[in-house]
Amino acid sequence: MMNRYYLLSVIVAFNLFSIAHTQSQTRESMSRELEEVARVATVMVDGDVCQRIMTERALKKLFVIDPRDQWAGSDNFDVNPEPFIQTKKTLMRLAKLRPYPIDCNLWMLFKENPGKIQILIRNQYEMSQFWTWGVLYQEIPPEMAEVLSSGKPKTISGKGDLISVLTPVYNSLGDIVGLVEVVGRLRVNWQENVK
């Protein structure tokens, strides 16, 4: 009984610390901390593995619109489990580098459709300044295009109290094949999605 009480006390204390730490963050300090996570993400996320996440079948059907079923593309979405799980775990570990809630999302380019980008892996809090719920792929936003062309990370403080750092993902040939969006929120609203 005492062990349960002790464990519960530790969990509550950690959560209160996380909330207090997040609430006391300034935009500048959070930006610096997210930039550090983004720097590590560029080194740790393997672009070759990321390029193997989507199955060939899913990639072929993604841009084909069936006149009888406009949502068939999402029905055909499929991933190769090994590279997906490996990358998802890496992104989840990166998000634990901060003591407050952040997400590390993987955005991937398409070889066949160079003007489009896809959020391939989202994480626990589903935070993003760029993703619209339900969208399989989208035009590349200007901020992402800048990172893709320069190869340099970019910090964006746009939507409300969200701060994102976009950082490139490289394959073994040195080509940029995608981005990681490291995103946090200055003020966490734990009731935001509760209706």
Model segments located where?
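Short N-terminal helix-loop-first-beta-strand/juxtamembrane motif that initiates sensory/input modules
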Residues: 40, 44-47, 94-115
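Extreme N-terminal signal-anchor transmembrane helix of membrane signaling/transducer proteins, especially
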Residues: 3-24
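Short amphipathic alpha-helical segments
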Residues: 31, 84-92
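A short beta-strand signature within small-molecule sensing/ligand-binding domains used
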Residues: 160-168
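Helix-start (N-cap) segments at beta->loop->alpha junctions
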Residues: 182-194
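Extracytoplasmic/periplasmic sensor domains and loops in membrane signaling proteins
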Residues: 82, 88, 120-159
